[in-house]
Amino acid sequence: MLNQKIQNPNPDELMIEVDLCYELDPYELKLDEMIEAEPEPEMIEGLPASDALTPADRYLELFEHVQSAKIFPDSKTFPDCAPKMDPLDILIRYRKVRRHRDFDLRKFVENHFWLPEVYSSEYVSDPQNSLKEHIDQLWPVLTREPQDHIPWSSLLALPQSYIVPGGRFSETYYWDSYFTMLGLAESGREDLLKCMADNFAWMIENYGHIPNGNRTYYLSRSQPPVFALMVELFEEDGVRGARRYLDHLKMEYAFWMDGAESLIPNQAYRHVVRMPDGSLLNRYWDDRDTPRDESWLEDVETAKHSGCPPNEVYRDLRAGAASGWDYSSRWLRDTGRLASIRTTQFIPIDLNAFLFKLESAIANISALKGEKETEALFRQKASARRDAVNRYLWDDENGIYRDYDWRREQLALFSAAAIVPLYVGMANHEQADRLANAVRSRLLTPGGILASEYETGEQWDKPNGWAPLQWMAIQGFKMYGDDLLGDEIARSWLKTVNQFYLEQHKMIEKYHIADGVPREGGGGEYPLQDGFGWTNGVVRRLIGLYGEP
């Protein structure tokens, strides 16, 4: 496993008198024995050991030179290049010629690397097609077939076909794929559902978790844990029986809870935080604390404006990417200033709701298999998590779920992430009713629901609306009997996407929905992307439920 399994702290060692090193806040007691600054890469089962390295690991100062020089407009381009020869030979050649007066960095890169392949398709959008027809015709365009592993490439080969989001994203992404699968099921593409189910199970078997995406530079983190929701979808659609995935679900759970048994109150390790009352909740995390390969220059620039140690900023930027909400006011100490990012100090409401679903799924499938002890254990875990969420993340005064700043011991900002407890059935009916009132008054627009009520310039904030948030809100409110609000969000979102499609003949990653006139969503570290996997998936599912807009 790469950068995933760190030696658990020995409980006996925690009792030894040692000098504690406080980093900004005494609540997170970081023992040197407990957390390493950067875990060493370990061999990934099924891959050559040399392929466990990221491009930044491999090319060292050459990587930094290329990214600093901005010879490609997108920082993701160079990490996605494949070397034409052994990387060590490339690095040796670079060190020999880099100080020559006539050295041309771009030519050097072009001579020694294959640039990322631009996927060519014969598909041309037909303005006469309905939205449903357009989406169904896009599935083959966004499908990638399995291929042999390219030596020293950052791309991790998968055994089966998969869907990519589109645009700059030429690999599969974990939580994106669940929402894409909703549409595949509606389109009758059980073949692709089976392939993607096999791929995610394979990744859990080989890496111990589902990484952010199938790139080496994504292996040090995951994304929102939605595999339990995928398994539920497979069962509903008759693609695969849920029982066959029980071991995979347990393995994913072990990844998210690693180190929990050794923590004392007010202490954190990787993804787990032991709260003051002894309960366990989770946070987003990345095992590396260096600039992201795919956004290297952006991360370096952000750290320069932080005032905090760069490695802390890098860790929090990476953890923000693991959240899927990269980036949002949710993770910022000062809204509107990315350099104030503090992702690892927040207990996110959506993450803990997804983990509640995972615990519940393990209990339910264990019951089907007659494993009574496992069922009882995980029902207790799910119940304990719900109780802890209600104690720390439920704002009873305002009737909303909020993230919790565990180091400052205070509630954080309100966002559309608050609807995830409804989607996974973790809330009670009073909480659902009160949350519905808050969403109506604070997030609902004629175009759908906003990611948050704060306008910061980050892409997961106002004025943007995102397909997965619409879907979870629609289904969540309807699950608790509020069909009126659920239907209103659904029809508003369908109208937004269809109106934009009629004008632009394309589907996009996010939409500006704050003023009732759908436009391209802004913000973020990269240009708006077309495609787009999860938008297609959610809209195709909604068309099946509500008809063409």
UniProtKB/Swiss-Prot annotation:
Instruction: Output the superkingdom of the source species.
Output: Bacteria
Q: In which pathway does it act?
A: Glycan degradation; trehalose degradation; D-glucose from alpha,alpha-trehalose: step 1/1
Instruction: Report the locations given in the UniProt record.
Output: Cytoplasm
* InterPro entries xrefs: 6-hairpin_glycosidase_sf, 6hp_glycosidase-like_sf, Cyt_trehalase, Glyco_hydro_37, Glyco_hydro_37_CS
Q: Which GO terms describe its cellular component?
A: cytoplasm
Q: What is its main location?
A: cytoplasm
Binding residues for substrate: 168, 175-176, 212, 221-223, 292-294, 324, 525
Tell me its EC number(s), please.
3.2.1.28
Name the catalytic site residues. Answer: 326 (proton donor/acceptor), 509 (proton donor/acceptor)
Q: Name one GO biological process term.
A: trehalose catabolic process
Which cysteine residues pair off into disulfide bonds? Answer: none
Give the UniProt keywords, A-Z: Cytoplasm, Glycosidase, Hydrolase
What is a single molecular function from GO for this protein? alpha,alpha-trehalase activity
Catalytic reaction(s) noted? alpha,alpha-trehalose + H2O = alpha-D-glucose + beta-D-glucose
User: Main role?
Assistant: Hydrolyzes trehalose to glucose. Could be involved, in cells returning to low osmolarity conditions, in the utilization of the accumulated cytoplasmic trehalose, which was synthesized in response to high osmolarity.
| Family (UniProt) | Belongs to the glycosyl hydrolase 37 family.
**Complexes and interactors:** Monomer.
Q: What is this protein called?
A: Cytoplasmic trehalase
Organism listed in the record:
Shigella flexneri serotype 5b (strain 8401)
